[in-house]
Design a protein with these regions (language model features):
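N-terminal glycine-rich phosphate-binding loop for ADP-containing cofactors
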Residues: 2-413
Length: 413
């Protein structure tokens, strides 16, 4: 049996005490993520102020929240009479003064632009009570830099929900350079109170946990396609039908949006260099042509008639262990750099992306020596940094920590 305590949605009495102090929440930005996050907090009993720059944006957001709540009622996840009660907990406004008044927590959900986010944080810092925690739902940008726009960097952190927030169980809690342990503990307890599973990102690194591991897998798949070693359909069929993943990598990229995948890829390349070397030949022509995936009806696949059919017959034409190897390698870097624990990484990948296993537990089951040798072989063949084994994996192999078969790997058995 694995000797570890998984992050869970059950809060301890100490955590509950921290969460109890949080009553009023401001959500800044009523777009897809913002209105979903506002709904999540309102469903958990919090009073919510939802802010955007135009009343029409707010009206649209409230209509979407009502639609979503009605769906919850249809599926008997809430009582029909609760719909109006939940909606009544959300007040909309275009005024920062109104939104920030007497709040205990703010969640910023504006577009991924650092200058814009810093302006939001500066305003919140000026107007919100000194006790209030200020958080960002960013998926790529620096929490530390946002905190620099405030006089309370100890109370600033990342609170990264996954899309759609009403349905996805995971939240990444990101610690900036000056974020206090109490702030992190409070946010962890709040996540549990709203029915989410939090994982702690101990350092303010680009991509946090989930997008970093996912980014490594995308890079490997894009280069494999570019080298002509497998078609996108063959890669996706193998990943889905042999690997048990919910989507193939190209299908997933289309679902996320190729503009977002390309933009995030550049952020990762800037942060980590050759380990995230982008493959512009694969993605740039599509982005330039406006083929951004599902949202535009075309990307790697044609989405005009719904989700593309990935032929089962093509499974087996791509070695899925290549995907696993680079995922394990990036997970090892996260552990090596003390960004996250193996348990939180595994929880993140399973709950944030629907993976059949976390990379650390997969490596322990497969054999860390097997993964290490796979990476070393690929690195010797291609001389590309994303195959270069992390020093942690080399260290584990030298120590004989090979996973389940030796009772010690990422976990102790």
């Amino acid at each position: 049996m694995i000797k570890l305590i998984k992050t869970a949605t059950i809060a301890t009495s100490g955590e509950m005490a921290l969460a109890e102090a949080i009553k009023r929440v401001a959500v800044i930005g009523a777009g897809a993520m913002g209105h979903g996050i506002a709904q999540v907090f309102a469903m958990a009993g919090f009073e919510v102020s939802l802010l955007d720059i135009k009343d029409e944006f707010l009206k649209n957001a409230m209509e979407k929240i009502r639609w979503s709540l009605n769906k919850f009622a249809e599926k008997r996840r809430i009582k029909p009479e609760d719909v109006d009660k939940i909606l009544a907990r959300i007040k909309t406004t275009t005024s920062y003064e109104v939104a920030a008044k007497d709040i205990d927590l703010a969640v910023e959900c504006v577009p991924e632009n650092m200058d814009l986010k810093k302006k939001v944080f500066a305003q919140l810092d000026q107007l919100a009570p000194s006790r209030a925690l200020l958080t960002s739902n960013t998926s790529t940008l620096s929490i530390t830099e946002m905190a620099s726009a405030t006089k309370r960097p100890d109370k600033v952190a990342g609170l990264h929900f996954f899309n759609p927030p009403q349905m996805m169980p995971l939240v990444e809690v990101i610690k900036g350079d000056k974020t206090s342990d109490e702030t992190v503990s409070t946010l962890v307890s709040i996540c549990k109170k709203i029915g989410k599973t939090p994982i702690i990102v101990k350092k303010d690194v680009r991509g946090f946990v989930v997008n970093r591991v996912l980014g490594a897998v995308f890079v490997e798949a894009f280069w494999t396609l570019h080298r002509g070693e497998a078609t996108k359909e063959a890669i996706d069929a193998s990943v889905k039908y042999d690997g048990g993943f919910p989507m193939g990598w190209f299908e997933l990229a289309d679902f996320v949006g190729l503009d977002i995948v390309a933009e995030t890829g550049l952020v990762m390349y800037k942060a980590y260099g050759e380990r995230f070397k982008p493959c512009p030949e694969v993605i740039e022509p599509l982005v330039k042509a406006g083929k951004l995936g599902q949202k535009t009806g075309a990307g790697f696949y044609d989405w005009s008639k719904g989700r593309p059919a990935i032929p089962f017959a093509l499974a087996g034409q791509y070695d899925v262990d290549r995907s696993w190897a680079v995922a394990v390698n990036e997970a090892a870097w996260l552990v090596y750099e003390d960004v996250a624990t193996p348990a939180d990484i595994d929880t993140g990948m399973k709950l944030g992306t629907g993976w059949p296993s976390g990379p650390c537990e997969y490596a322990d089951k497969k054999g860390i020596d097997v993964i290490y040798n796979k990476l070393a072989s690929l690195y010797n063949k291609y001389k590309m940094e994303f195959y270069n084994p992390c020093p942690l994996l080399e260290d584990y192999v030298k120590k004989g920590w090979l996973g389940k078969k030796t009772k010690r790997g990422f976990y102790t058995y």
